[in-house]
Swiss-Prot record:
This is Taurine import ATP-binding protein TauB. ATP binds at G40, A41, S42, G43, C44, G45, K46, S47. It catalyses: taurine(out) + ATP + H2O = taurine(in) + ADP + phosphate + H(+). One of its GO terms (cellular component) is plasma membrane. It comes from Burkholderia thailandensis (strain ATCC 700388 / DSM 13276 / CCUG 48851 / CIP 106301 / E264). The gene is tauB.
Length: 260
């Protein structure tokens, strides 16, 4: 399976106060059927790391690669989902999902067939012709996810995709993300501020320190795989170990913040 890697990447920005280091010597990887979650305080470089993986910007030092080949820009092998869904309101749902395929020159019938497939995957079958202003915030995020899946990327890069949703919709979306992951086997890199969400979704959890962003801890977790194997969400969240890990991570993040 393909592997997306960051090799000792650092990002330094120029500012009026001098050089500002956003990331420092960060190494990590995402492979197929993995969910790597980055967790840390605001300003710790999580979104900068995603930007490097997506090819939106180069690192100041270090390198990013897919299967050893350097990442020099965005690519169809990496689908990106943002907190702001960035949908085009003048297009209906299916045309939003198929837009990237259209830009790649895929014919109408083929791109619409693929769009319908991924809309079924995110449980939006029947909403193909709806305008964007006719659907809810959670549904808009599902359209954004479907759009990222339409080109069948090897990796999904998700920058706080659930951050703007209400609590109940967020829980539904967490379950949907795990369903999509189980169905597709994609490699996922996800950013969140929610410790509970990180514990639930991550197969590997990266804790980043406040600026400069460094990976200060890595945790292997099995709750997502337990769900994928058929265990209920209720059973997982009622597991005392889930609560223990959640509380321990909150304490760790608080210590990291206090040390700044």
């Amino acid at each position: 399976m393909a592997k997306l890697c960051a090799h000792q990447v650092s990002v330094v920005y120029a500012s009026r106060r001098g050089a500002l280091t956003a990331l420092e010597n960060v190494s990590m990887s995402v492979g197929g059927n993995e969910i790597v979650v980055a967790l840390g305080a605001s300003g710790c470089g999580k979104s900068t790391l995603l930007s490097l993986l997506a090819g939106f910007q180069p690192p100041t030092s270090g390198r990013v690669s897919v299967d050893g080949a350097p990442v020099t820009g965005p690519g169809a092998d990496r689908g990106v989902v943002f907190q702001d869904d960035a949908l085009m309101p003048w297009l209906n749902v299916i045309d939003n999902v198929a837009f990237g395929l259209r830009m790649q020159g895929v014919g109408r019938d083929a791109r619409n067939a693929r769009a319908r497939d991924v809309l079924r995957l995110v449980k939006l079958a029947g909403f193909e012709q709806h305008r964007i202003d006719e659907i809810s915030g959670g549904m808009r995020q599902r359209v954004g996810l479907a759009r990222a899946l339409a080109a069948d990327p090897s990796f999904l890069l998700m920058d706080e995709p659930l951050g703007a949703l209400d609590a109940l919709t967020r829980e539904h979306m967490q379950t949907l993300l795990l369903d999509v992951w189980r169905e597709t086997g994609k490699g996922v890199f996800l950013i969140t501020h929610s410790v509970e969400e990180a514990v639930l979704l991550a197969t590997e959890l990266l804790i980043l320190s406040p600026r400069p962003g460094r990976i200060v801890a890595r945790h292997s977790l099995d709750f997502a795989r337990r769900y994928a194997a058929g265990e209920s969400m209720r059973s997982i969240k009622s597991d005392p170990r889930f609560t223990e890990i959640h509380l321990a991570l909150v304490e760790q993040l608080m210590r990291e913040t206090e040390e700044v």
